[in-house]
């Protein structure tokens, strides 16, 4: 039987990752790994590896903040059933990394197997991570399962944005995917806090007993969101957001600032929602863990983008006195 191999190498420390699989297996097994360190005034990529369908691009520097702007590139155009892709990143002390994608994450129709994406992010002491990919678009009949796990060291901060479309809205394809399962878990260095899963509202109504079974008990000092959507078989799983086309979550978590900063940011974000009645509907809450969570639904992609960019700008200014960057997507 023929075998196939994918290779990729990094800038910085040379590293080659080889992926070997039987062609008879369904889907691709792709891994993307990054390691960042602070050197002088900049964050630099010191080690990386990737395997198909991921493609490696070195970070860019769009301003003088020293932030390493890192693009997650899948040139194949999306995920199909049976794909299992992963992203792992380690940020050492005092680094600042922004990870994004050049276009939407498309998930294509599948007859049986889901497309799976697993993300594991480790943020070192006093480091900053912004995980801000473009929206996920599940096509009609698609199956998608995603998990994002973040570990925060003392003084670390994460901005985590996760948005999903109801489908290919321009083609009048709405809530026609087979299933979407999502799990986000952010573990902080704080101890002695009550489990905060109850403080983080699940974005869509779930039928009793229909939440994903893979999630472990919530550790103390953690923020967890889990949901499962099955629009065709369980229409009630979509809940009240069925009349909207975009659903998004934003988590801003970290112990580098005090409670008064989070309260001020909560008020600023609430004011942004008040300026867009009818176009978006959202809420913001502080948590048992240090930080806040934002939930929102939007009528259109432009409404989602404008609101997200306004919130992102407010968060960056309040936390770091930095403007929102121009990511120059083409």
What are these regions (language model features)?
Residues 3, 8, 12-14, 18-136, ...:
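N-terminal, charged/glycine-rich beta-strand/loop interface patches
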Residues 19, 193, 204-206:
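Leucine-biased recognition of intrinsically disordered, low-complexity hydrophobic segments
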Residues 29-33, 67-68, 84-86, 116-118, ...:
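Broad gene-expression machinery/nucleic-acid interaction feature
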Residues 113-176, 180, 184-185:
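Internal, conserved structured core segments that host functional sites
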Residues 162-189, 218-330:
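A structural signal for small-residue-enriched, beta-sheet-centric alpha/beta enzyme cores
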Residues 189-195:
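Long, compositionally biased low-complexity repeat segments characteristic
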Residues 198, 205-213:
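Short Gly/Ser/Thr- and charged-rich N-terminal loops/segments
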């Amino acid at each position: 039987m023929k075998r196939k191999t994918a290779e990729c190498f990094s800038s910085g420390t040379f590293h080659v990752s080889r992926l070997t699989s039987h062609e008879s297996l369904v889907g691709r097994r792709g891994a993307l790994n990054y390691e960042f360190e602070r050197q002088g005034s900049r964050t630099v990529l010191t080690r990386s590896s990737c395997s198909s369908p991921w493609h490696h691009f070195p970070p860019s520097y769009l301003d003088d903040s020293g932030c390493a702007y890192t693009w997650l590139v899948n040139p194949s155009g999306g995920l199909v059933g049976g794909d299992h892709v992963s992203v792992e990143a380690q940020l050492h002390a005092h680094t600042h990394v922004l990870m994004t994608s050049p276009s939407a994450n498309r998930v294509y129709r599948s007859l049986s197997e889901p497309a799976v994406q697993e993300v594991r992010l480790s943020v070192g002491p006093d480091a900053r991570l912004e995980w801000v990919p473009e929206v996920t678009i599940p096509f009609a009949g698609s199956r998608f399962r995603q998990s994002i796990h973040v570990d925060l060291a003392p003084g670390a901060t994460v901005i985590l944005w996760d948005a999903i479309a109801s489908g290919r809205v321009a083609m009048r394809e709405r809530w026609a995917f087979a299933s979407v399962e999502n799990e986000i878990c952010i573990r902080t260095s704080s101890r002695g806090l009550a489990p905060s899963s109850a403080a983080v509202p699940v974005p869509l109504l779930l039928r009793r007993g229909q939440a994903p079974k893979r999630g472990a008990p919530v550790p103390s000092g953690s923020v967890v969101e889990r949901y499962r959507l099955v629009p065709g078989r369980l229409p009630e799983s979509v809940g009240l957001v069925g009349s909207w086309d975009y659903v998004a979550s934003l988590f801003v978590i970290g112990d580098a600032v005090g409670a008064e900063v989070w309260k001020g940011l909560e008020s600023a974000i609430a004011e942004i929602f008040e300026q867009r009645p009818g176009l978006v509907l959202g809420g913001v809450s502080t948590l048992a863990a240090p930080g806040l969570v934002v939930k929102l639904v939007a009528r259109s992609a432009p409404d989602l983008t404008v609101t997200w960019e306004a919130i992102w700008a407010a968060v960056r200014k309040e936390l770091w006195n930095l403007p929102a960057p121009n990511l120059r997507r083409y």
